[in-house]
């Protein structure tokens, strides 16, 4: 009887441990914003990491493996011209493809997320990314 209880306790502990290791992670749906408002999209999707003023110090920045860049300095770091195509590609494809030296893929790949707002149609998502890029371009330090 004593051995049966011991075996039961061991199996119970193994089952609990095994169950804890099979945690399922569900994605959170993206919040709908105006497709036309780059500012609204920035505040909803970018400010947590890049900061309210796009300087890189958002409340979630400390959780990132690589510190989010100051988005107001992109033009200054590119000879005075906002790197629109590169910025757009980073939003569309993520940093692993566009900036391999970036390190980890902390930043989401926004194309599929934004496409999900329009029944997975890519066209409206591309327009959203264009408007977001135009907004960030308007934030460049003079």
Q: Locations of the language-model features?
A:
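Extracytoplasmic electron-transfer domains, predominantly the class I c-type cytochrome c fold
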Residues: 65-121, 132, 136
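Bacterial N-terminal signal peptides
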Residues: 7-15
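Short cysteine/histidine-rich zinc-coordinating motifs and their immediately flanking basic loops
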Residues: 59-63
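Positively charged n-region of N-terminal signal peptides that target proteins for export
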Residues: 1-4
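Sequence/structural segment immediately N-terminal to covalent heme-attachment motifs in c-type
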Residues: 31-55, 87
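Electrostatic cytochrome c docking/interface patches
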Residues: 18-41, 79
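Sequence context surrounding c-type heme c attachment/ligation sites in exported
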Residues: 36-44, 119-127, 141-142
């Amino acid at each position: 009887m004593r051995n049966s209880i011991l075996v039961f306790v061991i199996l119970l502990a193994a089952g609990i441990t095994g169950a804890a290791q099979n945690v399922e992670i569900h994605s959170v749906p993206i919040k709908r914003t105006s497709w036309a408002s780059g500012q609204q999209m920035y505040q909803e999707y970018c400010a947590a990491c890049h900061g309210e003023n796009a300087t890189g110090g958002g409340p979630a920045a400390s959780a990132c493996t690589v510190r989010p860049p100051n988005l107001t300095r992109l033009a200054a770091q590119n000879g005075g011209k906002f790197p629109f195509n590169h910025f757009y590609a980073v939003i569309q494809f993520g940093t692993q493809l566009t900036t391999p030296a970036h390190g980890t893929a902390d930043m989401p790949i926004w194309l599929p997320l934004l496409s999900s707002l329009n029944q997975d149609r890519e066209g409206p998502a591309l327009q959203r990314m264009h408007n977001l890029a135009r907004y960030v371009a308007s934030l460049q330090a003079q």
